[in-house]
Design a protein with these regions (language model features):
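ATP-dependent carboxylate activation and anion-phosphoryl transfer catalytic cores
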Residues: 1-176, 313-316, 321-328, 332-335, ...
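Phosphate-binding loop of NTP-binding sites
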Residues: 479-619, 623-634, 733
Length: 734
């Protein structure tokens, strides 16, 4: 029988923390239809076909907990939603992306499943899931499937949409030290941290990288002159505009020479060890295509090295290797390149490969073609048995030598970066032995590069990977800096808008420029920027990217957590006012039907509380108090009276609480109490008369106290809140 396609009822991209995980995910709702009655062990040949197309599935542990765990589930019989989850993950891994997380859960309707998996980019995730369905259906119906074409297509999406390797290793290091990040573009411009504490990177450039310094480094002649003036060894050279001038300069300098574009990069257009007039003229032609002018330099004998300088220290170094082929008397040069060089797994077309493929018939292969011609060969030539042919002299910087760098060489490299003005620089050094001073080896610095590639240090072919991303993050942030500003998140259905405005006001009075995203609009430092509902992801993110803000307050709802996820990764204070009831929309769209399911949604706010932060919970609601165990930080309860079982138990254990006692709002820590103000105080009484709930007032006090706002300032702020925020008073009245 031919099975009908599994229906994808909805695919949703959750960009921030959600009920499943902290990371961005695809959440798909699917209808298995007749496939609900046909698990994997009920379809002849299904498992063999899936495993044949995707042998990497053996590495998926699944719930079994060990290698081959998912295959065990396949053999025992598992449903197609679960299989689509794992296939989606495997396809992304094959595309070079990361996707370590996934779940598949049946909802209350038979045959309807939620399938969830992590993705680095929405387009990649969506396309992977569509491909997963196609693979599952082909396996079920015993149809052919071109897995290679599918993976190639997904690789192109990943290369285009995901972070490049240099940026990714910095972001990974930031995440490791709990520093949040936001992608500001579809490219590699990334913000590390929030608000006024943020820093920005673009590949291996930072917001400390001077535009002037970058311009200097791209002008190789100017770079050399500045380095020479500071006593740093560089090869002498001349700028030329024609092939004739190139040959004249080569004779003046003395053969052999290096011919390269004045403003080139990545070694493109560079010819080394050129020692004939014909070679110089051909090299000039190749270099002229890559830059505005051409530079002729003295050839320095030795190996090429890349030394990475971050701040004022060397953090990594690699040595280059010459790419060669060995003749067999049968194969052509081009065939030998494909069989002996391009089969190296380190080589590829995508940015994630540390080495490029060598294609003689492409513009990037022109330098290799010239190298071959200098040895009297052509692509179709057949080298004799055992003859070694050099194909590429530069650009293969992939052997780690960090531990070998002589202190004097490191000092020269860091000085070169300072002279040019770069905070992060790739210093290209030619020397016969990097473990000896350059004076002894007659070595020299040949280039200083802004925005250096980091992949060679993260994935060297030989030697130890170096934590260069970590070094860059430590350069941007001090030892005790996380890039975070105080973030307050509020969820519930009882006066959360008013509460968010109260908390933002108190933060403002404490001296922090505070942003607020709530139902009433978007506020930046008490300026009302718009009256449209600003509780969603995009409006909230506007606050986090604003360099002027020292703190931010966010109101959210269960629906927004389910539809988008939260805009921030963690919060200093998480507040839950009550456990909302479900709604027809939540039932129909998300299958949230019970109080336990609603708790799973609301707990997201408390899951995000930082260890140094606090969960502020309404002790008058038992469903809310049960969330206390989920907080990584302190728990601070508030209640209308002290005579609350949860509050009493909490105080007995030395915890903090806020409650009303004999008409006074009271702060308590253990058995110590401080009366803050009386509810009959004129301005406070007016707020309450106008509709502000006592519990909302108590929640605001508790939040402010957890933010270390002084009690006297809390009292003063609440007294004049209504007067200074007339729009809030109007909201309460009407």
């Amino acid at each position: 029988m031919a099975f009908k396609d599994i229906q994808i009822l909805r695919m949703n991209y959750l960009r921030g923390p959600n009920i499943w995980t902290y990371r961005p995910i695809i959440e798909a709702l699917i209808d298995l239809g007749e496939m609900e009655d046909h698990p994997s062990n009920k379809i002849d040949g299904f498992n063999d076909r899936i495993n044949g197309w995707l042998p990497g599935l053996v590495e998926h542990h699944c719930g079994v907990g060990h290698r081959g765990g998912f295959l065990t589930r396949l053999v025992g019989g598992t449903w197609m939603g679960h299989i689509m989850e794992h296939v989606s993950i495997e396809l992304q891994l094959l595309a070079g992306a990361r996707a370590e997380f996934g779940k598949a859960r049946e909802i209350s309707k038979r045959g309807i499943y939620k399938v969830v998996f992590r993705t680095e980019h929405e387009e990649l995730g969506r396309e992977s899931f569509l491909a997963a369905r196609a693979i599952v259906m082909a396996a079920a119906n015993n149809l052919a499937f071109d897995i290679t074409a599918t993976v190639d297509r997904l690789k192109k999406i990943a290369d285009l949409r995901c972070l490049g390797p240099s940026t990714a290793c910095i972001v990974d290091a930031a995440v490791e030290r709990k520093t949040p990040f936001i992608r500001l573009t579809e490219g590699n411009l990334v913000q590390l941290g929030y608000g006024a504490k943020q820093r920005r990177i673009w590949t291996a450039e930072t917001d400390r990288t001077s535009a002037i310094a970058e311009s200097i480094s791209s002008d190789k002649d100017l770079t050399k002159r500045l380095l020479t003036q500071c006593g740093i060894p560089v090869p002498e050279g001349q700028i030329v505009k024609t092939a004739d001038e190139a040959w004249e300069a080569a004779q003046d300098i003395g053969l052999p020479v290096v011919v390269k574009p004045l403003d080139g990069n990545r070694g493109w257009g560079v010819s080394l060890d050129v020692n004939t007039e014909e070679g110089v003229r051909a090299a000039w032609t190749a270099a002229e295509k890559e830059g505005s002018e051409v530079l002729i330099e003295r050839y320095v004998r030795g190996d090429e090295h890349r030394v990475l300088v971050v701040g004022d220290r060397v953090v990594a170094a690699t040595r280059g290797e010459t790419a060669c082929i060995t003749g067999d008397g049968i194969s052509t040069v081009e065939q030998l390149i494909d069989s002996q060089i391009n089969t190296d797994p380190r080589r590829g077309l995508a940015e994630g490969f540390p080495l490029d493929l060598i294609r003689l018939n492409t513009p990037r292969g022109e330098m290799s073609l010239l190298e071959i011609q200098r040895q009297g060969l052509k692509p179709e030539s057949i080298p004799t048995q055992g003859r070694i042919v050099v194909v590429q002299r530069n650009g293969n910087l992939n052997n780690d030598v960090t531990d070998w760098v002589h202190p004097d060489v490191a000092a020269v490299a860091t000085l070169a970066a300072r002279v040019i003005g770069l905070d992060i620089a790739g210093i290209d050094i030619v020397t016969q032995d990097i473990s000896r001073p350059l004076e002894e080896t007659k070595g020299a610095i040949i280039e200083v590069n802004a925005g250096p590639g980091l992949l060679m240090h993260v994935k060297p072919a030989v030697g130890q990977p170096r934590p260069v991303g970590k070094a860059i993050v430590e350069h941007l942030f001090g030892p005790n800096e996380s890039g975070r500003i105080p973030v307050v998140g509020i969820v519930g259905s009882q006066q959360t808008t008013e509460l968010s405005q109260l908390v933002a006001w108190l933060l403002h009075l404490s001296g922090k420029r505070t942003g607020l995203a709530c139902k009433d609009g978007l506020y930046m430092d008490q300026q009302h920027l718009g009256k449209s509902d600003s509780r969603g992801f995009e409006a909230s993110e506007r606050l986090l990217i604003n360099r002027a803000l020292d703190a931010a307050v966010f109101e959210t709802t269960p629906a927004l957590i389910l539809d988008e996820g939260l805009a921030y990764d963690r919060c200093l204070v998480g507040i839950v006012t009550n456990m909302p009831d479900t709604t027809p929309t939540l039932i129909d769209k998300h299958d949230i039907q019970t109080s336990d399911q609603m708790r799973t949604v609301v707990r997201t706010q408390i899951d995000l509380v930082l260890p140094e932060g606090a969960a502020v919970l309404n002790a008058d609601e038992q469903a809310v108090t049960s969330l206390a165990e989920l907080s990584d930080g302190e728990v601070l309860f508030y209640a209308k009276t002290k005579d609350n079982a949860t509050m009493l138990t909490h105080l007995q254990s030395g915890g903090r609480g806020v409650y009303c006692k004999e008409g006074h709002v009271t702060l308590a820590r253990g058995d110590q109490e401080t009366q803050l103000f009386h509810l009959d105080l004129e301005l406070i009484a007016r707020l309450l008369k106008n509709g502000l709930h006592i519990s909302t007032l108590l929640a605001a006090v508790a939040a402010a106290w957890s933010l270390d706002i002084a009690p006297l300032l809390i009292r003063a702020g609440l007294k004049n809140f209504g007067q200074q925020n007339q729009h809030v008073a109007h909201t309460l009245q009407g």
